[in-house]
């Protein structure tokens, strides 16, 4: 009984951290009240959520001008640092990538230059020639590290999902075994296995579908002090013709340390791949599917939350040292010693969601951002798989901001043309899309909430995240980028991570705006005529099955 009880205690502690944030406090209260229940099972929409514009607090107006050291210009988002560490960086260290090819070349180049650490977290590693190129780059860098005149002791840590990474005779594990066998002291491969896939369920569900129960879905690629956050996996299509989003954080040591520790934490509660292709648990750790589930989840919660708390404490101390007057001398001394780093104009917040471990930070932050988006603000939200949670749908339909939601047309859905039952998944998404569009029209919200479908010949679409434009602004000041899809799986089943980037830099805002425009330019607006097209006719059995399976994809 200890595990369920831990949830409300966690929320009460968070409430104590949030004085003066009634909107966020209200959300935390709601999350606490519904702990242990599935809001997705409600048959009716909660009518009070449609009053969200009246219930949400007025966004405070910033009256003091921003200075070079204090993030007053983004004051309205500082509440996020009550939940997670806040990393202040210069926008010159942030670069937005635009294409799969650029992403692939960056990964290879960064691996080749790494001297100290390579940390990669992904759903899986593919088995084709492009993926082999990455493995070869890792092998070459490890070899060079050991043979150099001054060995750099390069360490490689890879975190993948167990079910997806073990599928088929040739898989992620077999791709990485040569590295593990040749460099056993320098390579670690961790395979996360959800605690929810166990017992009879694990025996009965076919290999192709067992990943529906829960996954390691985090996508972080880290090289020394450089970090790539993305929604892209390590597979050939993500390097060629599967559109995603990517941001490159250069020379950001504190952020790199945080994500290294996060991947280490998840790795410690995962199965460890051995040189003979067997797996084992870390000494002293509860087995994820053979051991006691509650004990495993408690241990995993503690391991991950310790990383978040310690990083948050470190950043608070750093913030205090930077901004207090008694630290001015040390700043001058640092500058004289050659530390010429520009003052931060951009703030990075890591948002973690691991509902199996009762960690719901990303959910809290996302709901609060949607709740507090004022009239006149614009939210551009994109997901490769349009299957919003009920809470997110309620907030989109019930708040004041304008929404443009970008989703995949059936032809660029990753499941389009798949064999068997999976081939019907694009039709299920069309059905969900049509239902949501019907609600938008039924509420007379067509002018405020707009759906757009991405289409590109020969490509698939996997981009996710959002861009927030404050009222009266033509450029975004905040973006969310990472692995979550805003759907039931992301919130309830999988391990997810993304970052909130808040910036005052016009140059970075221009980068983010251009990224958004490039994606939306390849889309068309959804109207009632969209669903009358021949390819949009959904079979009756798909309509009947969709409500039963929508929480699994």
UniProtKB/Swiss-Prot annotation:
Annotated ranges, domain PLD phosphodiesterase: 212-238, 457-490
Role: Functions in the biosynthesis of the anionic phospholipids phosphatidylglycerol and cardiolipin.
Record-given protein name: CDP-diacylglycerol--glycerol-3-phosphate 3-phosphatidyltransferase, mitochondrial
Listed GO MF terms: ATP binding; calcium ion binding; CDP-diacylglycerol-glycerol-3-phosphate 3-phosphatidyltransferase activity
UniProt organism field: Cricetulus griseus (Chinese hamster)
GO terms under biological process: cardiolipin biosynthetic process; diacylglycerol metabolic process; phosphatidylglycerol biosynthetic process; phospholipid biosynthetic process
Reactions mediated catalytically: a CDP-1,2-diacyl-sn-glycerol + sn-glycerol 3-phosphate = a 1,2-diacyl-sn-glycero-3-phospho-(1'-sn-glycero-3'-phosphate) + CMP + H(+)
UniProt-annotated binding residues for ATP: 121-128
């Amino acid at each position: 009984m200890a595990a369920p009880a831990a949830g409300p205690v966690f929320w009460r502690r968070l409430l104590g951290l949030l004085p003066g944030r009634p909107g966020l406090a209200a959300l935390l209260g709601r999350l606490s009240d519904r702990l242990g229940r599935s809001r997705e099972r409600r048959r009716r929409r909660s009518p009070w959520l449609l009053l969200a514009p009246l219930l949400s607090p007025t966004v405070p107006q910033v009256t003091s001008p921003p200075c070079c050291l204090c993030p007053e210009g983004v004051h309205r988002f500082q509440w996020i640092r009550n939940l997670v560490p806040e990393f202040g960086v210069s926008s010159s260290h942030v670069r937005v990538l635009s294409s799969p090819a650029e992403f692939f070349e960056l990964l290879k180049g960064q691996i080749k230059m790494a001297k100290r650490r390579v940390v990669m977290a992904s759903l899986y590693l593919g088995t084709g020639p492009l993926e082999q190129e990455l493995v070869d780059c890792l092998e070459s860098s490890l070899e060079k590290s050991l043979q150099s005149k001054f060995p750099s002791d390069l360490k490689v840590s890879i975190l993948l999902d167990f079910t997806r990474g073990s599928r088929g005779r040739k898989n992620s594990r077999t791709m990485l075994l040569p590295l593990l066998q040749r460099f056993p002291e320098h390579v670690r491969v961790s395979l996360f296995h959800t605690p929810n896939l166990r017992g009879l369920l694990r025996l009965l569900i076919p290999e192709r579908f067992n990943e529906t129960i829960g996954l390691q879905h985090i996508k972080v690629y880290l090289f020394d002090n450089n970090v790539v956050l993305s929604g892209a996996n390590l597979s050939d299509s993500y390097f060629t013709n599967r559109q995603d989003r990517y941001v490159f954080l250069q020379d950001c040591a504190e952020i790199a340390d945080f994500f290294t520790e996060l991947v280490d934490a998840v790795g410690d509660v995962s199965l460890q791949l051995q040189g003979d292709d067997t797996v084992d648990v870390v000494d002293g750790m509860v087995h994820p599917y053979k051991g006691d589930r509650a004990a495993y989840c408690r241990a995993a919660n503690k391991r991950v939350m310790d990383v978040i708390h310690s990083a948050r404490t470190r950043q608070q101390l750093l913030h205090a040292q930077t901004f207090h007057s008694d630290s001015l001398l040390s700043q001058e001394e640092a500058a004289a010693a050659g530390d010429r780093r520009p003052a931060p104009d951009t703030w990075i917040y890591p948002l973690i969601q691991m509902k199996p471990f009762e960690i719901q930070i990303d959910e809290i932050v996302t709901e609060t951002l949607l709740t507090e988006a004022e009239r006149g603000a614009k939210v551009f939200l994109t997901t490769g798989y349009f299957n919003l949670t009920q809470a997110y749908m309620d907030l989109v339909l019930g708040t004041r901001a304008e929404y443009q939601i970008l989703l995949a047309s059936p032809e660029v859905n990753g499941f389009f043309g798949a064999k068997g039952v999976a081939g019907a998944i694009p039709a299920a998404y069309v059905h969900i899309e049509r239902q949501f569009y019907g609600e938008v029209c039924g509420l007379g919200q067509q002018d405020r909430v707009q759906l757009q479908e991405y289409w590109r010949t020969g490509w698939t679409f996997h981009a996710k995240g959002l861009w927030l434009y404050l009222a009266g602004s033509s450029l975004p000041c905040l973006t969310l980028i990472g692995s979550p899809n805003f759907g039931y799986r992301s919130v309830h089943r999988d391990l997810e991570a993304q970052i909130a980037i808040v910036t005052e830099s016009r140059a970075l805002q221009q980068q983010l705006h251009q990224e958004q425009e490039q994606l939306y330019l390849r889309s068309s607006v959804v109207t009632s005529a969209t669903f009358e097209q021949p390819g949009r006719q959904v079979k009756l059995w798909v309509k009947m099955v969709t409500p039963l399976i929508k929480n699994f994809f």
